[in-house]
Structures are given as structure tokens and as C-alpha cells.
Amino acid sequence: MDKSTDALKVGGEAYRLLLENDRVRVLELRMKPGAKMGMHSHPSVVAYSFGEAKNRWTLPDGKTEDMQLKAGQVIWSGPFTHAAENTGKTETHLLVVELKKI
């Protein structure tokens, strides 16, 4: 992964590294309402939402996607690059498991 688009580097204090080995990287994400994060990349991921989350993703081509998660919802995605904004009224709190080897 290009370090200039590494979520942990771009996300600043929003991301906290919980575990990393040669197969996975486990991150905790906490974004306050209105918070924005610059363009960054993820390999394939599984994410768990601790609470309600409402976010807008901006893709490299400028298109936007609104993402709404419920408490306890789990999502999976292949590799992607995006910028993020918490458009909700509550903190976005996710456990993000990045898969290094599939």
C-alpha cells in the first residue's frame, strides 16, 4: 500500500492501530460529526459498526456515495480509495479489519 494514501497516516487521530501482523491490520475508527478525512486507501476490509453511522464517501473520480450503517452491522469490501465525511449527528465508531493476504 502506498504510504501517502495509508488510512492510518491520512486519518490522524481518527484511526487507532489495535493489531498488525503479516495477514491483517485491525483499526478502530472514531469520527466526530462533521469530521472529514482526506483521500486514503484500504485493501479488502471487514468492518463492524458499534453504533449508527452516516458518512459520505468521495471517490477518486469525484463521485460521492452516502453510507448509512446500523449498530451491529458488518460490511465487507474489496480494495478501495475514498475520502470520508461524517454527515451524521453521532460519532462514527467502527472496527476495521484490513486483510493483507486473501
Predicted segments with their positions:
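Basic/polar N-terminal segments that are highly enriched at the extreme N-terminus
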Residues: 1-13, 101-102
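Short beta-strand segments in beta-sandwich/barrel cores
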Residues: 36-37, 53-58, 74
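Ligand-binding loop in jelly-roll beta-barrel domains
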Residues: 79-102
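Histidine-centered metal-chelating micro-motifs
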Residues: 34-37, 75-85
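A short glycine-rich, His/Asp/Glu-containing loop-to-beta-strand
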Residues: 11-36, 43-47, 97
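Glycine- and acidic-residue-biased ligand/ion/polar-headgroup-sensing regions
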Residues: 42-61
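Short acidic-glycine-tyrosine-enriched beta hairpin
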Residues: 61-79
